[in-house]
Amino acid sequence: MKHDIASSPGMSDLEKEVATNAFEAFKTGSYDESLKYLDNLQELNKEDYKITMNKTVTEFYKSGQTTSSTNKESAALKAEFTAMIEAAKSKMHQYKVRAYIQMKSLKACKREIKSVMNTSGNSAPSLFLKSNFEYLRGNYRKAVKLLNSSNIAEHPGPLKTGECVRCMFWNNLGCIHFAMGKHNLGLFYFKKALQENDHTCAQIGDGSNAQASKKFSGIPMCALLANKRYELLYNCGIQLLHIGRPLAAFECLMEAVQVYHSNPRLWLRLAECCITANKGSSEQETKGLPSKKGIVQAVVGQGYHRKIVLASQSTQNTIYSEAQSAAIPVASMEFAAICLRNALLLLPEHQQHDSKPDNGSKSYSQSGGTESGSETSDACSGKTQEGDKFIPAAPSSPLRKQEVENLRCSILACSAYVALALGDNLMALNHAEKLLHQAKLSGSLKFLGHLYAAEALISLDGISDAIAHLNPENVTDVSLGVSSSEQDQGSDKGDLEPVESSGKQTPLCYPSSVSSARATMLFNLGSAYCLRSEYEKARKCLHQAASMVNTKEIPPEAILLGVYLELQNGNTQLALQIIKRNQLLPSVKPGSSPDFRKKPLSFQSTQPVQPIQTPSSFTQVQRK
């Protein structure tokens, strides 16, 4: 502390006296008294910076020539950083769990889940992740219980975190009930999620005017990405497809594809909507059961001139109109062909040596967002291998190599079916042959591949090649395939509790057994023999097939084939009895009466029996 302020020019006698007293008190160590004098002096002369400097020196000596303010600030910062690091560790564990779930690595996910629960406790994000884990293992009831135990009311809300927990809660319930086969209930939950999402978007605003732009100023950037409408529409579309409402599903998926146009699965689902909407409204096609109304169209005339008019088996595209372009998004077979072409183009280049079948899957939203994408199984697939490349398929989880190959099989099967429906037999044959050349193919798709190839060949007058495809020995398996996720789950779980039943059933449109599939092959083989006028072989195939299945499972096309064979054999009365009883009857050989019947015009272009099965793979739900 300097005393030169006493000699400063312009100071009054009072100021000099106070300054002298302050200096004397400082020299004697009376720092408190010195500070009082300096305060009084500063009131007298507020513009002198030397007074402020002397006060600082006095305070420094008063504290023992040390200062603790920096240490206190450092300690506070250290505590703050420690809390931030702990929060970051918790977030990192959550992100690792989500990454393992996307990679379908349940073993690593199980270990990481424990770290999440230790660091985050029973917070909503941690419980959502654990529920997701149990959901992937097939423990659906436990997953629902964990979701219900989460206290979503404590979550800060979408305006602070960018995550609408209520929306994710309803979406996750919808995913779980989808996996349990309760599609109507799952659709209800998805609609609730859409309502919550719309409410959140209304809170944030759309930014279309100046007021909304000002409103965004206090909202974090992540909150602007809280809209999950298109993911939820994707989920709703898949649920509607399973319920049997393809047109409503088509509308939902068309909105989703505007955002996720690079997802090949989504294009396949759109094609399946078109196929289902155009399959026909007859009950026998939908349920696989014969109907007399599907055979007899009308009865005309009376008495001796009474005639039975048989129904035409040609299918018509009731959705598509010739006046509009096929590129217009309408649920038509023409648009289905475009969707399937897009799906094939979006798949990576085929690698035959390591191709693996695919399992489609439905992703599950976690604490970071609502991810969806319902997918289905079509063929068997293997376990995850190290080095697998993942193909992006937003909004669902990335596709592994075996999933890509299985997806390719499904697209090829649908493409062959659509090409046949459109009369493009060369393209149908091309797709069917590509399907049959896939390295790993499920029994059901192999069965369909042979049927579609045979039908295309018959239309191209390649009956001999078609007969080779229709050999019943080609059918040795009609399984829909085992998902890679189910295999992973089995290997990860070890001796843990068994997976509960999901409630899903094998779809009716697939053959229930190998014998049923071979019977369908024989029905079609009989049609092929008919075209070569080998009626005895056709009759043997027909009755052999009829003996392999229940009477109610015989398709109406097979009954019409039996009528045609009896007419060719001259057994008019037996043909009438087959129509009246709507079932095949033992053939009776006539006497030596000549066979004067010509081949009816309506049977000159007899097609193989249209398989009851459909290539659309959405009828079976499969997990990742």
From Swiss-Prot:
Main localization, broad class: cytoplasm
Family matches, as SUPFAM superfamilies: TPR-like
Gene Ontology CC terms: CCR4-NOT complex; cytoplasm; nucleus
Membrane-traversing stretches: none
The UniProt record lists the keyword Cytoplasm: yes
Region (Disordered): 351-397, 480-507, 589-624
Transcription regulation listed as a keyword: yes
Amino acid composition bias (Polar residues), ranges on this chain: 602-624
One BP annotation, GO: negative regulation of translation
Subcellular location: Cytoplasm; Nucleus
Name this protein carries in UniProt: CCR4-NOT transcription complex subunit 10
UniProt organism field: Danio rerio (Zebrafish)
Lineage: Eukaryota, Metazoa, Chordata, Craniata, Vertebrata
